[in-house]
Design a protein with these regions (language model features):
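Phosphate-end processing signature that detects enzymes handling 5′-triphosphorylated RNA
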Residues: 1-137
Length: 137
């Protein structure tokens, strides 16, 4: 599985744009990240991003949200809220009142300990897939 996205952090001191490519395979997860200037972002929005596996990738959706971070020991928690999913081509959008909580820690962390600390139901969730399901026409 591969994710190709341009990302920004508008409500932080980080004013950069990033081209992120995330690969998930049986060997593990790998992420590359390249800083882009606004001119490159505009170019990629119009011309697309060429990928050897997928060809030219054009933007489909914007996903906008607020993110808060917390640390509990060696566990990082991110909470996403005020999510807005927007179809790039049609400008239709979906406001989502859900909260998305993500927990990250080192691979050495014992899963049983995590389940005791955070007794939530675990689900796999993709903001992009949610946008596809709710905004595709």
């Amino acid at each position: 599985r591969k994710k190709i996205r341009i990302r920004a952090y508008p409500n932080t001191s980080d004013k950069n744009f990033y081209l992120e490519i995330k690969n998930s395979s049986v060997e593990g997860r790998f992420k590359t990240r390249k800083i882009l200037n606004k001119k490159m972002v505009n170019f990629y929005e119009k011309a697309g991003i060429f990928d050897n596996q997928y060809g030219t990738c054009l933007p489909n959706f914007y996903v906008i949200y607020e993110r808060e971070y917390s640390m509990i020991g060696d566990v990082r928690i991110s909470i996403d809220k005020n999510l807005v999913y927007k179809n790039y081509r049609t400008d239709t959008f979906y406001n989502d009142t859900s909260l998305i909580v993500e927990i990250k820690t080192s691979i050495k962390k014992n899963l049983d300990d995590l389940i005791k600390l955070f007794p939530f139901q675990r689900i796999r969730f993709s903001k992009y897939c949610f946008a596809v399901d709710n905004l595709s026409q």
